[in-house]
Amino acid sequence: RSSDLYLWKKMSLFFGMKGAAYEPKELRMAYETKIKEQEAALKMECRGSHVPEIDIADVFRQLFEDQAVSVTEKEIADLAKMFRAISIEELKLFPGVPEMLQRLKDAGKKVFLLSNAQALFTAPEISLLGLTKYFDGILLSSDAGVKKPDPAFYEMLLKQYHLDPAECLMTGNDDIADCHGAASAGIASR
């Protein structure tokens, strides 16, 4: 819903309060342009070898810089959370998720989260939903600079947590990103 006019009215108000004057539609267009520019730059930097992931903080920071306004990292983080809160309809878990994660933990399994997501708002959402305690490790694409289905993202997780791909199982909600990506890294999936 990042195209929603209500979102961009609120975002332009926040930017304006910080001294960066944007009209809502102008801000949305500038935001979309910055994302495309960053994605293109990352693809060039990586020579097409993987699926790059931008960090939304850099986009917001550049939007302020374009208006000659400096902001703190906390202000960027707060803006990202506001952006997310306005742009989603609700934040809820699929039924049975905490119970399933607890059963895995009770069975002595290690549970890791590998997600195509922006850390600035996803990490607080994971905490808000009470899920942090279930994970032995969390790797978010904006922190890694790469996203699923790129095998490099899976390999980062394997290396960081000293995991053997033959002993791992990937479950997810996207056949291409989750299952095919896992298979490319030698991880079984369901």
Task: Describe every region a protein language model picked out.
Residues 1-94:
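N-terminal helical cap/lid subdomain that shapes the substrate entry/recognition surface
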Residues 20, 109, 187:
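Short phosphate-binding/catalytic loops that engage adenosine nucleotides
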Residues 21, 70, 132-136, 164:
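Conserved H-loop
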Residues 71-72, 98-103, 150-154, 174-181:
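Short glycine/proline-centered loop/turn elements that form peptide/ligand docking sites
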Residues 74-93, 97-128, 135-141:
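Substrate-recognition element of Asp-dependent hydrolases with the DxDx(T/V) motif
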Residues 112, 139, 169-171, 190:
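Hydrophobic/aromatic beta-strand patches that form the interior of the parallel beta-sheet core
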Residues 147-176:
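Conserved Lys-Pro-Asp/Glu-containing loop-to-beta segment of HAD-superfamily phosphomonoesterases
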